[in-house]
């Protein structure tokens, strides 16, 4: 009961029934129709990560590292890390492509790894012909959060071997680096490392300090290795230039002295020249006036 003015008594409306009706309407709105279900399933199929054979372009029945024995796996994620491996590692030996990942999301659509331009997104897997247990992944595409577990299962499998060593290379913008100093005073680019508990080799640079964190696919791979007790190290290059950049690529050079990459690079000066040619080609392709 409620009073509107002195002496008058009226009934106040009860909200109990109204709230029940609102909840029923919300439930009806949330109830999935057959059309909604079909759209959701189509989108889920479209977002599936597929690992294809190089020759036949058919899907692998088992994960990549279940099919091929692996002792060393180097993963480059992002354009600058990919350019580093292309110039310094892949040009120092004969590498054979064993597969490629096909995926689609809001940020990228992977292209075939043959006849690529420098702007196309791709994710290719290779092994060294002279030592097929040495694997390399070049991933220039964005793997969305809901696709990362799929990617890990397609590459490592549900019960991975522990007798291999993983090295991950990637970049982040220097503004993501948390420090008491001003980021403007930091000597960008610079390397930091983060490793799993089972990785016993020394890192070639300082370890990443708390409260800094890693993101996206590099974080997913490192977490996966930590859970499965696989020795793994992530080398993270903080830079103020996220596009393909010569100085940023060369910031990875200290990694060449590590056990992971030692012996894979034959001629550093020749590889540097190859890198410069790659950068020149990229600048020409990026110039809309040429």
Swiss-Prot record:
Coiled-coil residues are none
Quote one Gene Ontology molecular function term. proteasome binding
At which residues is N-acetylalanine found? 2
The PTM entry states: Degraded by the proteasome upon completion of 20S proteasome maturation.
One GO biological process this protein is involved in is: proteasome core complex assembly
Name positions with the PTM Phosphoserine. Answer: 182
The family database entries (InterPro entries) matched by this protein are listed as: Proteasome_assmbl_chp_1 (IPR016565)
- What's in the GO CC field? endoplasmic reticulum
Identify the stretch(es) annotated as Disordered: 1-39
Q: Which residues carry this modification: N6-acetyllysine?
A: 266
Q: Where is the composition biased (Basic and acidic residues)?
A: 28-39
The entry's family comment says: Belongs to the PSMG1 family.
Task performed by this protein: Chaperone protein which promotes assembly of the 20S proteasome as part of a heterodimer with PSMG2. The PSMG1-PSMG2 heterodimer binds to the PSMA5 and PSMA7 proteasome subunits, promotes assembly of the proteasome alpha subunits into the heteroheptameric alpha ring and prevents alpha ring dimerization.
User: What is the recorded name of this protein?
Assistant: Proteasome assembly chaperone 1
Query: Could you tell me which species this protein originates from?
Result: Papio anubis
């Amino acid at each position: 009961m409620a009073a509107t003015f002195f002496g008058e008594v009226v009934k106040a409306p009860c909200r109990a029934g109204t709230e029940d009706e609102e909840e029923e309407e919300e439930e009806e709105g949330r109830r999935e129709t057959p059309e909604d279900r079909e759209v959701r399933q189509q989108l889920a199929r479209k977002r599936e990560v597929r690992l294809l054979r190089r020759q036949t372009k058919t899907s692998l029945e088992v994960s990549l590292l279940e099919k091929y024995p692996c002792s060393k796996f180097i993963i480059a994620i992002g354009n600058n890390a990919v350019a580093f491996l292309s110039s310094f590692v892949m040009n120092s030996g004969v590498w054979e492509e064993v597969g490629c990942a096909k995926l689609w999301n809001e940020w990228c659509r992977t292209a075939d790894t043959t006849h690529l331009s420098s702007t196309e997104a791709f994710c290719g897997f290779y092994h060294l012909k002279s030592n097929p247990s040495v694997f390399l992944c070049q991933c220039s595409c964005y793997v969305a959060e809901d696709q990362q577990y799929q990617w890990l299962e397609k590459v490592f499998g549900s019960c991975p071997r522990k007798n291999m060593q993983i090295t991950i290379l990637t970049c982040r913008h220097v503004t993501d680096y948390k420090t008491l100093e001003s980021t403007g005073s930091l000597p960008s680019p610079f390397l930091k490392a983060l490793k799993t508990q089972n990785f016993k080799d020394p890192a070639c640079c300082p370890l990443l300090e708390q409260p800094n964190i890693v993101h996206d696919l590099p974080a997913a791979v490192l977490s996966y290795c930590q859970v499965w007790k696989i020795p793994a190290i992530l080398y993270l290059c903080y830079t103020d230039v996220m596009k393909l950049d010569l100085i940023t690529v060369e910031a990875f050079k200290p990694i060449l002295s590590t056990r992971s990459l030692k012996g894979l690079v034959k001629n550093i000066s020749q590889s540097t020249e190859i890198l410069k040619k790659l950068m020149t080609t990229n600048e020409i392709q990026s110039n809309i006036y040429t």
